[in-house]
Regions:
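Short, conserved beta-strand edge motifs with alternating hydrophobic and charged residues
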Residues: 1-4, 35-38
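Glycine-enriched alpha-helix->loop->beta-strand junction motifs that scaffold or abut catalytic
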Residues: 28-33, 52-59
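Short acidic/histidine-rich active-site segments
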Residues: 39-43, 61-64
């Protein structure tokens, strides 16, 4: 079941104020696994805590990954103005994207 507890879709910063009391109340009323949409705006430390202490089974973090890719693509294109090949360009930000993806996965994996 998808819930919202202070999180916002398409949030591009990590300043969400998550209502953990609301999450606890919701999970006390249902045995259905919870989904937290808009998780990109939630700090990694809090995501890790929620993953290990609640029945949230899915964190939607697409905006965080798209923002990482887009920000790094812009930066790499500025640093490499002589690269025009689209395959080379699209590969420039992949290392940063892999790093952020790894961090995200590590912080939402149940223990």
């Amino acid at each position: 079941m998808a819930i919202s507890a202070g999180n916002v879709h398409l949030q591009t910063n990590t300043s969400s104020s998550i209502d953990t009391d609301a999450i606890e109340k919701i999970q006390s009323l249902t045995s259905i696994p919870l989904v937290l949409h808009g998780s990109s705006g939630i700090d990694h430390t809090l995501r890790r805590k929620l993953a290990s202490t609640t029945n949230i089974c899915k964190f939607n973090i697409g905006t965080e990954l798209r923002k990482t890719f887009g920000d790094n693509l812009r930066k790499k294109m500025d640093q490499n103005p002589n690269i025009y090949d689209r395959i080379q360009l699209i590969n420039l930000p992949l290392q940063e994207l892999k790093s952020v993806t790894k961090t995200v996965i590590e912080n939402i994996t149940k223990f």
